[in-house]
Design a protein with these regions (language model features):
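N-terminal glycine-rich anion-binding loops that anchor highly charged ligand groups
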Residues: 25-35, 41-59
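Anion-binding alpha/beta catalytic cores of soluble intermediary-metabolism enzymes, centered on
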Residues: 93-161, 202
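Rossmann-fold NAD(P)-binding glycine/threonine-rich loop
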Residues: 105-127, 231-283
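Glycine-rich phosphate/diphosphate-binding loop of Rossmann-like nucleotide-binding domains
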Residues: 40, 45-54, 135-229, 238-251
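Short, well-structured alpha-helical segments in soluble
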Residues: 77-89
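Short glycine-rich anion-binding loops that position phosphate/pyrophosphate groups of nucleotides
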Residues: 97-103, 169, 215-217, 235-236, ...
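Positively charged, low-complexity intrinsically disordered leader regions
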Residues: 1-31
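Short beta-strand elements in bilobed, periplasmic/extracellular small-molecule ligand-binding domains
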Residues: 57-71, 185-191
Length: 283
């Protein structure tokens, strides 16, 4: 029996509709949420990603700005662009599209963003607040997964969640979010990675399995507990197709599964917009 589809595209559309109503209320009060993107260099994929985020923002009534710097831009140039956006009261959310060209320090740039405008949730202050249980913004993919599981009524509380991947964007923040004493969370979390010995021994115990290691088809059917909910964060080009970290046969074992594309990706963008609206809501 094929797994139930965890339809991130449909859930994200519902979230955007909800946000549009709040954006309208904020705009009527003279505070239209606005997202600014800093784009450095001429990487084609980065331009595509920023364009898709801006279009999604505009569909929800969120204002969007784009600051483009050439590939020759220095660290000082990028930091100056961020400082200008920090000072602009009409901008509520700032994202710096990664990767930056070689020679630039993305950590210093991310740390320069005003924490109250850090809608990617990567500033040290926001990371610390997440760990403390008082989050302002959480990384968009991580919180998007939590929201998708909640809205698709996947039982998380009391479950064993296994995350494969320890990155700052997904694995580590997601472990904090899923283990939090909060509705839609309160799971026991095991955080694994590509260096974990006997990985399948952990994944086969998972009620909720998140594949976020960045390796195509790494999670095979034999590694999945029958009936488990599987979230595939992978996004890899294979010829003319996009594939994930989960092998195709997993759909015959899992109870629920996110598609690639159309699963986690739309949720990431939706939560970026949600964070932007939340930033505009701040006094």
């Amino acid at each position: 029996m094929a797994a139930r589809v965890l339809d991130g595209k449909a859930v994200a559309a519902a979230i955007r509709g909800e946000l549009a109503e709040e954006v309208e209320r904020l705009a009527a009060a003279g505070r239209r949420p606005t997202l600014a993107a800093v784009l450095v260099g001429d990487d084609e994929a980065s331009h595509i990603y920023v364009g898709s985020k801006q279009r999604a923002a505009e569909r929800s009534g969120i204002g969007s700005r784009r600051v483009e710097l050439g590939a020759e831009a220095s660290q000082k140039d990028v930091l100056a662009a961020v400082a200008e956006l920090n000072a602009d009261e009409g901008v509520h959310g700032i994202l710096v599209q990664l990767p930056l060209p070689a020679g630039l320090d993305p950590t210093e740039v991310q740390d320069a963003i005003d924490p109250a405008k850090d809608v990617d949730g990567l500033h040290p202050e926001n990371e610390g607040r997440l760990l403390r249980g008082d989050p302002r913004f959480a990384p968009c993919t991580a919180i998007g997964i939590v929201e998708l599981l909640r809205r698709e009524r996947v039982p998380v509380e009391g479950s064993h969640a296994v995350i494969v991947g320890r990155g700052l964007l997904v694995g580590r923040p997601l472990a904090v979010l899923l283990s939090a004493k909060a509705p839609g969370a309160n799971a026991t979390v095991t955080l694994c990675h590509t260096g974990t010995r006997g990985l399948s021994g952990f994944t086969r115990q998972a009620d909720v399995l998140v594949a976020a290691a960045g390796r195509p088809a790494m999670i095979t059917p034999e590694m999945v507990k029958p009936g488990a909910a599987v979230v595939d964060v992978g996004n890899h080009r294979a010829g003319d197709r996009i594939v994930g970290d989960v092998a195709p046969g997993v759909a015959e074992v899992a109870g629920a599964l996110t598609p690639v594309p159309g699963g986690v990706g739309p949720m990431t963008v939706a939560m970026l917009l949600a964070n932007t609206v939340a930033a505009a809501r701040q006094p």
